[in-house]
Each structure stands twice: as C-alpha cells, then as structure tokens.
A protein has these predicted regions:
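Basic/polar phosphate-binding segments, predominantly the helix-turn-helix DNA-binding elements
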Residues: 13, 21-57, 77-99
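Hydrophobic, helix-rich cores of sensory/ligand-binding and other regulatory modules
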Residues: 1-3
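Terminal helix-turn-helix DNA-binding modules in bacterial transcription factors
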Residues: 11-12, 44-83, 105-118
C-alpha cells in the first residue's frame, strides 16, 4: 500500500523525532495539515492511531537498544522520548508483555549461551 505524501511526511517526522516529546499537533503543523485531518488520514492509511504508531515505534526502538547496547534502562527511556523511566517501564511491559529488564536479561542469557557453546 502506498501512503499519501502527508502520511509519509508524518511517519518520517516521527522517525526523526521520536526521542523527544512530540504531539499530533506538532506534526500536523509541520506538514501543514490540521490535527483532525492528519488524525483521520493517518488512521485510515496505516490502520493505527497516530499515538499508537508513535508509542509502537518508540518501544520497538527501546527493545533494539536493550538488545544491542549496554545503555541503562533509564537512559533508554530518555533516549526514546519518555520523561519518566517508571512510565516507560509500564508502557514497555504493557506493549511487549515483559518488562525491559526481562528483555535485557534474555539478551545476556543468549550471549552467554553462545559464549559457552564455543
């Protein structure tokens, strides 16, 4: 499916700015559309609400950081745009089904298994 230019621009803006506090209003202003119009268009083309897409993108980025970096969980929370690490942990747990510490420990377990099998 091919997204409209407005939705492509909104998605690009999210990908470029997910690490800070952004809103539908801000993105709508950036692409010269009303928030109501962007909200409807985004949902109709992507199947997701703007806020759900933003949250999903942030939490998937966080998962990648938990797996691929040694950053502390609170650092990752800030790096993906959350201002409160405890809220980040709650949202991560709700979205991923496990807490960020579990994702991190699974990575550590996998890397040890690889090391021990050599």
């Amino acid at each position: 499916f091919r997204y409209s230019q407005s939705v492509r621009d909104a998605i690009r803006y999210i990908h470029d700015n997910y690490n800070r506090d952004i809103s539908l209003n801000e993105v709508a202003r950036y692409i010269y559309r009303s928030p109501e119009y962007l909200s409807r268009l985004f949902k109709s083309e992507t199947g997701e609400k703007f806020s759900s897409y933003l949250m999903s993108y942030r939490l998937n980025k966080a998962r990648d950081m938990l797996i691929n970096t040694d950053m502390k969980i609170y650092e990752i929370a800030y790096a993906v745009g959350y201002t409160t690490p405890s809220y980040f942990s709650k949202m991560y747990r709700d979205f991923m089904g496990v807490g960020p510490e579990v994702t991190r420990s699974q990575r550590n377990t996998r890397s040890m298994e690889g090391y021990m099998s050599k």
